């Protein structure tokens, strides 16, 4: 009996052990499946948190303004969040990688950096990314304000920043820049006309040269692409025999457009402003020409037709303050 009992006991023990092993395996499978579900849920949760953080970053209410309201009681413009804001932030990031190369090249051609500014990064990007009409950039409005400030013998950056140093923005100037860009982006308007009207109200008008008893403007349009920037450069430097002039330069390509500006003076040289890189000065036109053709055009990536390297329009302006 003992041996029999012993025999059955062993069988029963083995059966019990097998059952326990099967049970343990099933339990482990359930736990493993549960772990996968938990890890998947956590991964999804982390993605949601990252997206939420990105949205909050884009819509952050962190104040960088000298005060909450403009002089006439208006608040800093913002719109509802859109996923395009994230896309534009990525594009700005790519462009911002070109800033060091462009700035470092200025001194190599005898130029000086008057002010380091870039709408593609930092505090200014944080401000324009808050509104869908300025998220892609505010280059047109920035150039218009730069021309006005320069014509008045002032610096745009003294007007934009408290104390003329990067940090807090003066809301009146920031609001004005953003609003001009927003006005020019409306579906039923021509942005060039909006800018021209704004400049005219600020004492700056398009140059007109008398030809055959007519007074046409001296706007110039042309192509870059495979031709390179020579035609564009000639249009920028041409002062039409007057010796000076403000230039608003629009560059366009297959997928985007960009505005830059310049003040050209036969005696004092060229002051150049690109909202993506800052304000630079060259004491003579020859220095500027070499820099623009041999360095800037490629370092900025503006030579790519897919970007803004296909065609251009150059507007010339006169000012009462000149």
From Swiss-Prot:
TM region(s), chain numbering: none
Family annotation (Pfam families): Peptidase_C58
One example GO MF annotation: cysteine-type endopeptidase activity
Protein's cellular compartments: Secreted
Chain segments annotated as coiled-coil in the UniProt record: none
Catalytic residue list: 139, 258, 274
Gene3D superfamilies: 3.90.70.20
GO CC, alphabetical: extracellular region
Single GO BP term: proteolysis
Taxonomy, superkingdom: Bacteria
Assigned EC number: 3.4.22.-
Keyword Metal-binding attributed: no
Top EC group: hydrolase
Keywords, ordered alphabetically: Hydrolase, Plasmid, Protease, Secreted, Thiol protease, Virulence
Quaternary structure annotation from Swiss-Prot or TrEMBL: Interacts with human ARHA.
Family: Belongs to the peptidase C58 family.
Function of the molecule: Cysteine protease, which is translocated into infected cells and plays a central role in pathogenesis by cleaving the C-terminus end of the human small GTPase RhoA/ARHA, a regulator of cytoskeleton. Once cleaved, ARHA loses its lipid modification, and is released from the cell membrane, leading to the subsequent disruption of actin cytoskeleton of the host cell.
Protein name: Cysteine protease yopT1
Biological source species: Yersinia enterocolitica
Gene: yopT1
């Amino acid at each position: 009996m003992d041996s029999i009992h012993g025999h059955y006991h062993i069988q029963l023990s083995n059966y019990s052990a097998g059952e326990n092993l099967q049970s343990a395996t099933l339990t482990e499978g359930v736990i493993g499946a549960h772990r996968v579900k938990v890890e998947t849920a956590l991964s999804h949760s982390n993605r949601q948190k990252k997206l939420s953080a990105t949205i909050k970053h884009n819509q952050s209410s962190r104040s960088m303004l000298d005060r909450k309201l403009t002089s006439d009681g208006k608040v800093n413009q913002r719109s509802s969040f859109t996923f395009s804001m994230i896309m534009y932030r990525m594009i700005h990031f790519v462009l911002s990688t070109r800033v060091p190369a462009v700035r470092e090249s200025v001194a190599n051609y005898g130029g000086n950096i008057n002010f380091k500014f870039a709408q593609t990064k930092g505090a200014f990007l944080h401000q324009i990314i808050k509104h869908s009409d300025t998220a892609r950039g505010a280059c047109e409005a920035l150039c218009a304000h730069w021309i006005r400030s320069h014509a008045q013998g002032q610096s745009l950056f003294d007007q934009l920043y408290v104390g003329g140093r990067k940090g807090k923005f003066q809301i009146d100037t920031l609001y004005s820049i953003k609003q001009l860009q927003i006005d020019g982006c409306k579906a039923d308007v021509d942005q060039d006309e909006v800018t021209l009207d704004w400049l005219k109200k600020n004492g700056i008008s398009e140059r007109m040269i008398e030809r055959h008893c007519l007074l046409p403007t001296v706007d110039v349009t042309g192509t870059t692409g495979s031709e390179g920037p020579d035609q564009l450069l000639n249009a920028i430097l041409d002062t039409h025999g007057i010796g000076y002039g403000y230039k608003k330069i629009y560059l366009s390509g297959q997928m985007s457009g960009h505005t830059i500006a310049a003040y050209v003076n036969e005696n004092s040289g060229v002051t150049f402003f690109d909202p993506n890189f800052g304000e630079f000065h060259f004491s003579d036109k020859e220095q500027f020409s070499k820099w623009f053709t041999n360095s800037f055009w490629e370092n900025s990536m503006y030579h790519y037709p897919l970007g803004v390297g296909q065609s251009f329009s150059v507007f010339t302006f006169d000012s009462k303050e000149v």
